[in-house]
Structures are given as structure tokens and as C-alpha cells.
Amino acid sequence: MSSPALLDVFTSTGALLNGHFKLTSGLHSNTYFQCAKVLQHPEHLAEICRHIADHFKKNNIDTVISPAIGGIVVGTEVGRQLGVKTIFAERKDGAMSLRRGFSIEPGEKILVIEDVITTGGSVAEVIEIVKSYGGEIVGVGTVVDRSNGKVTLADNQYSLLSLEVRSYEPADCPLCKDNIPLESPGSRASKNN
């Protein structure tokens, strides 16, 4: 799937939003990718995840792990297409952890999957969890990389759509200075209120 084709899918499903948004990272932006609006359609989910799975299929992956909540749907479908176990990390008391009986064995080959990367903070936390269990990171896959490749989390990193979308520190946000109402559409409260 080409970048223009994926952008068309985001646009046609109402998943590419323009306005003034507070991102999970605490940064502000005039563009928001609401992946859930694309991924709710099984045909889009399957096609998007097929491209990600195809990129990593020769890496002998044992397990796919995703950060909750945005990465769970993508991670589960990529894992299904690769025929491997899928798990997720979730926040407890503000920190990512494995719960629900999930575990990682030493030497287990792990692929980290996320829907959207801006700063890479959640994925970096998941990578640290994997390493703390002795797992081996074989790659990171995402649907959208808002940093246009500036955020590098693994040697083998793949994003279906990689583009630079402006993000601002709240104190430097021109949208705030123009008094444009701020929306917080993310899956959890942002880090910087």
C-alpha cells in the first residue's frame, strides 16, 4: 500500500483530523491520526497489517507485543498474519508493565507493533520491558510515523506511512497563541497537562 493510498484511506474514513490537538506525548499539533477509525474496518485492518507482517515475516518472530491501547488491534492482526503469539503492555500507576499473565522468555524474539509514533515514548517503554525479561527485539513496526523517521527505536524499523507532522511544545504552540480550542482525542491522558 503506497503512502498516498494510505492517506486516502485515512481521509475517506474520517481518520485524518485537522484542528488543534493535545497528543499523548503532551505536544500539540494541527494534525491527528485517529487510527481506530481506519482499523474498525476489517478490510483496511487486514491490508495495512499484511504490509507490516510481510516486512517482518523472515525475522523468525516468536511474539508480537504492543503498547495498550492504540497498538493492540494492529499488533493482534500482525501476529495473526505471522502466526505467532500476541501480547500487550499496559499502564499501571503510570508505567508500562506486563499484566494478565503475559510473560516473555529469555531469548524470545519479539516484534513491537504500534499504531502511531510521535516521540516513541510508549514503544521505548515496551522495548525496556522486553529487555528486562531477556527478550530480543527483532524490530518495530508502525502504521504511521509522525516523525518522518527521526525517531529510531530499533535497527529494523518499518512504518507504512512516514511523514513529518509538526508538533509543538505547549508554550510554543502557535495554535494556542491564536486561541484555537484544544482537543485531546488520545487513548490516555497526556503526560504534560
Swiss-Prot record:
Orotate binds at residues 118, 146. Gene3D superfamilies: 3.40.50.2020. CDD domains: PRTases_typeI. Its EC number is 2.4.2.10. It is an enzyme of class 2 (transferase). Its cofactor is Mg(2+). The keyword Magnesium applies. InterPro entries: OPRT, Orotate_PRibTrfase_bac, PRibTrfase_dom, PRTase-like. Catalyzes the transfer of a ribosyl phosphate group from 5-phosphoribose 1-diphosphate to orotate, leading to the formation of orotidine monophosphate (OMP). Belongs to the purine/pyrimidine phosphoribosyltransferase family. PyrE subfamily. This is Orotate phosphoribosyltransferase.
